[in-house]
C-alpha cells in the first residue's frame, strides 16, 4: 500500500513539476531509517552518565579553553593525594553568640 502511494506521489510530482510531492515519499524513508533508530538509540542511552552537561563541561574546561581531565577524589591513588586535590572546607558558626543580641535593623550590638 505504501509503495503504491510512493509511486503515485512520484508520478504526481513529475506531472505537476512540483517536487514537494516527493517530500511525502521521502518522509517515510526518513522516518523509518533515520528517526526511529535515532529515537531507539536515545532511549537506550538515556541512563548513560557520559553525556556532558553544562555543569560538568564548565568544570572540565581549562584556562586555554581545552578540556582537562576531571580529577575524581574517589579514584585517587592514595588518601593523601585525594586530600590535596580537595578545596578546604570553611565551616561557619551559624549559631549566634549568647552575649550578642540583634538590633531591630539587623546590626549586632554588644550588651
From Swiss-Prot:
Compositionally biased region (Basic and acidic residues): 81-98
Enzyme class, broadest EC rank: transferase
Tree of life domain: Bacteria
This enzyme's EC code(s): 2.4.1.-
Subcellular location: Cell membrane
One term under GO cellular component: plasma membrane
Membrane topology term: Peripheral membrane protein
Start and end residues of each stretch annotated as Disordered: 56-98
Keywords of the record: Cell membrane, Glycosyltransferase, Membrane, Nodulation, Plasmid, Transferase
GO molecular function terms listed in the Swiss-Prot or TrEMBL record: glycosyltransferase activity
Cell membrane in keyword set: yes
Parts forming coiled coils: none
Major localisation: membrane
Repeat as UniProt keyword: no
Functional note: Involved in the synthesis of Nod factor, a sulfated N-acyl-beta-1,4-tetrasaccharide of N-acetylglucosamine which initiates a series of events in the host plant species leading eventually to nodulation.
Similarity annotation: Belongs to the NodC/HAS family.
Protein name per the record: N-acetylglucosaminyltransferase
Organism: Rhizobium tropici
Gene name for this UniProt entry: nodC
